[in-house]
C-alpha cells in the first residue's frame, strides 16, 4: 500500500513528482536560450580568462585575483572551441547539475524517492537562478558529488580504482572552488574511519614513516599555498572578519538556511516588513538547522560517516565565512536535500512531520513561481535588463539589446561589461 505522505518513498504522489521533474527538465533546457546572465563574480572569471588568453598587466585585478582556475579552464576550453556563448554555459551547467544529482542519488537510492529528490533540488530558487549564470557552482557540484559517489562505491567494493577516481574528482572540485578542501578532508577522515583497526596497527609499527609523510604534506601546503590562492584567501578573510563579527556571521547563516527552506530570497519579504521579515527567516533557519544537526549527528541514522564529516567541515568553513549570500550553500544543498529526505522518513515526531509537510507546500509553490519567472525573463529583454543582478547592469544590457539606454537614470557605463556582452552573449 502506497504512503499518503508526499515526502515519503513509495508515496502515491510519485507520478506527480515524475511529471514535475520532466517539466523542470524542459524549464532548465529553455533557460539555455537566455541572454548572458552576468554576476560580479562572472565578470571576474571572464577577466581572469582574458588575462590568461590575451595577457594583462601583472598588477591588474585579474592577474592578482585569488579565484582558483578550475572554472576558468572551462571558459578557456570553450573559447578555444569557439562556443563560449551563453547557450553553451547554461547547457554545460545543466549537464553538471543533473550529472551531480545522479551521482548523489546512487548513494541514497535505497532510502529516498528519486523524482522527489530531483524536484526538491531543481525547484530551489538558488539552482533555478544560478544554473543560468557563468559561475563555478555547478561544476563544483558535479565533481564533488562524483567524488562522493566513487568514494561510497570504494567503501562498498574496496577497489583501489574507485578511490583513485574519488580523489581525482575531489581534486578537480578543489581546483574549482577552494572550499573543496572540506571534501578532501572528509575523504581522509572516511578512510581513517573505514580502516581504523588496520591503521592503528600500522601507526604503532611505522611512527617515523607516518611522521615523515605528515611533515611532507605540511611542507607542500606551505610551498604551494600561494599558487593555490590560500595566502590571498587568508588576507582577504582577515580584512573582512573586522567587518563581520561572529554574531553577525551567525545571523547570516541562519537567515540563509531560512531562505533555502522557505525557497525564496529574504529581501523579497524584508522590503515589505523590514526587520520582522529578517528575524522570521533567522528564526526558521535556526529551528531547521537545530533539527537537522540533532537528527544527523545525535540520533541513529544510516547516513555514511564521511558525508557527515563533509557537511561538518563545510559548516565550520561557512560559519566563519565573512560574507552573506545563500549561494554559498549551493555546493552542499543537494547533500542537504538527500539527508533531509532520509531523516524525514525516520522522523517519529508528529509536529516535525506536519511542519515539514506545510513547509514543503510553500517550497513547491515558491519554487514553481521562481522557475516560471526565470523563463519569462529569459525571453523578455526589457524585463531581463531591468531585473538581472537587481538591475546593476541595466544600462549595459539595454545598450547591448537596444543600442541605447531605455531608462532616464542612466549615468555611466562599464566598458568591460559591454565588451563581455558583445563578445560572449549568444
What does each model-found stretch correspond to?
Residues 13-18, 104-125, 142, 161, ...:
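Transmembrane-helix signature of polytopic, membrane-embedded enzymes
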Residues 357-426:
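Membrane-embedded, lumen/periplasm-facing catalytic core of multi-pass transferases
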Amino acid at each position: 500500500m502506497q504512503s499518503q505522505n508526499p515526502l515519503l518513498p513509495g508515496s502515491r504522489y510519485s507520478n506527480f513528482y515524475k511529471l514535475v521533474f520532466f517539466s523542470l527538465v524542459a524549464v532548465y533546457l529553455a533557460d539555455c536560450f537566455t541572454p548572458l546572465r552576468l554576476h560580479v563574480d562572472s565578470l571576474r572569471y571572464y577577466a581572469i580568462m582574458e588575462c590568461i588568453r590575451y595577457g594583462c598587466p601583472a598588477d591588474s585585478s585579474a592577474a592578482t585575483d585569488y579565484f582558483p582556475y578550475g572554472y576558468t579552464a572551462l571558459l578557456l576550453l570553450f573559447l578555444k572551441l569557439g562556443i563560449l556563448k551563453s547557450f553553451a554555459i547554461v547547457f554545460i551547467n545543466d549537464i553538471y547539475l543533473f550529472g551531480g544529482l545522479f551521482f548523489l542519488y546512487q548513494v541514497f537510492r535505497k532510502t529516498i524517492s528519486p523524482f522527489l529528490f530531483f524536484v526538491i533540488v531543481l525547484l530551489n530558487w538558488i539552482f533555478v537562478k544560478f544554473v543560468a549564470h557563468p559561475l563555478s557552482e555547478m561544476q563544483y557540484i558535479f565533481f564533488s558529488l562524483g567524488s562522493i559517489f566513487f568514494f561510497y562505491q570504494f567503501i562498498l567494493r574496496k577497489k583501489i580504482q574507485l578511490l583513485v577516481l574519488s580523489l581525482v574528482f575531489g581534486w578537480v572540485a578543489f581546483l574549482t572552488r577552494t572550499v573543496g578542501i572540506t571534501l578532501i578532508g572528509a575523504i581522509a577522515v572516511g578512510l581513517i574511519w573505514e580502516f581504523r583497526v588496520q591503521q592503528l596497527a600500522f601507526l604503532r609499527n611505522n611512527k617515523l614513516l607516518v611522521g615523515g609523510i605528515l611533515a611532507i604534506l605540511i611542507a607542500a601546503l606551505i610551498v604551494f599555498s600561494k599558487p593555490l590562492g590560500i595566502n590571498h584567501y587568508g588576507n582577504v578573510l582577515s580584512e573582512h572578519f573586522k567587518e563581520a563579527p561572529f554574531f553577525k556571521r551567525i545571523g547570516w547563516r541562519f537567515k540563509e538556511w531560512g531562505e533555502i527552506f522557505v525557497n525564496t530570497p529574504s529581501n523579497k519579504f524584508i522590503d515589505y516588513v523590514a526587520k520582522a521579515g529578517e528575524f522570521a527567516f533567522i528564526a526558521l533557519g535556526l529551528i531547521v538547522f537545530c533539527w537537522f544537526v540533532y537528527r544527523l549527528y545525535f540520533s541513529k541514522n544510516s547516513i555514511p560517516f564521511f558525508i557527515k564529516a563533509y557537511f561538518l567541515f563545510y559548516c565550520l568553513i561557512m560559519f566563519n565565512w565573512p560574507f552573506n549570500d545563500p549561494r554559498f550553500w549551493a555546493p552542499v544543498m543537494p547533500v542537504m536535500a538527500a539527508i533531509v529526505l532520509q531523516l524525514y522518513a525516520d522522523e517519529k515526531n508528529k509536529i516535525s512531520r506536519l511542519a515539514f509537510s506545510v513547509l514543503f507546500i510553500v517550497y513547491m509553490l515558491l519554487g514553481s513561481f521562481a522557475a516560471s519567472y526565470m523563463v519569462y525573463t529569459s525571453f523578455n529583454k526589457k524585463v531581463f535588463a531591468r531585473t538581472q543582478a537587481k538591475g546593476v547592469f541595466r544600462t549595459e544590457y539595454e545598450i547591448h539589446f537596444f543600442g541605447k539606454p531605455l531608462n532616464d537614470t542612466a549615468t555611466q557605463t562599464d566598458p568591460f561589461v559591454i565588451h563581455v556582452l558583445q563578445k560572449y552573449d549568444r
